[in-house]
């Protein structure tokens, strides 16, 4: 599949939504989501990991957490606009570059969702946030701790473990 794969997938989704109608599309989407989550739970159970709660990333937007996190950064003076996008001044907190939170098209980034989740975690009364990342996401450590500082949270309350799979012959 040549070209921009994300645009291709977005086009397929748009066509499916148009052909099915909004209600049927949401039903098919939810069925697929439930199936995938069941598969993930089964895989994790095989590793001896059973969660009490799964958190929906979608709720970060629907509950206004992403918006609140961005507003908090703005209120704290840690956002600026450049080329139509909103940027978090992550370099003020030791990151190697500033990070986009709202693209020039008005859509929030995945990092903006991380901000909302981080805010939510501490608002729900947790005294620490534990993240487990693949080793290829090591750059996220400084970024996430910078985000905590920008939100007025204690970065020492964030613990990040890196894991890497290996094949042993």
Model-predicted segments: where are they?
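NTP-dependent nucleotidyl-transfer catalytic core
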Residues: 1-169
């Amino acid at each position: 599949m040549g070209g921009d794969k994300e645009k291709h997938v977005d086009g397929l989704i748009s066509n499916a939504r148009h052909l099915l109608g909004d209600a049927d599309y949401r039903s098919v989407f939810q069925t697929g989501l439930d199936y995938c989550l069941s598969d993930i739970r089964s895989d994790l159970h095989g590793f001896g990991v059973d969660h009490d709660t799964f958190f929906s990333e979608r709720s970060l937007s629907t509950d206004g957490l992403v918006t609140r996190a961005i507003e908090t950064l703005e209120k704290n003076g840690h956002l600026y606009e450049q080329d139509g996008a909103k940027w978090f001044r992550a370099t003020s907190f030791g990151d190697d570059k500033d990070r986009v939170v709202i693209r020039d098209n008005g859509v929030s980034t995945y990092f903006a969702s991380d901000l909302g989740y981080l805010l939510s975690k501490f608002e729900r009364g947790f005294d620490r946030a534990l993240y487990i990342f693949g080793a290829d996401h090591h750059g996220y450590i400084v970024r996430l701790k910078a985000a905590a500082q920008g939100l007025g949270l204690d970065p020492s309350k964030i613990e990040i473990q890196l894991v890497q799979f290996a094949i042993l012959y």
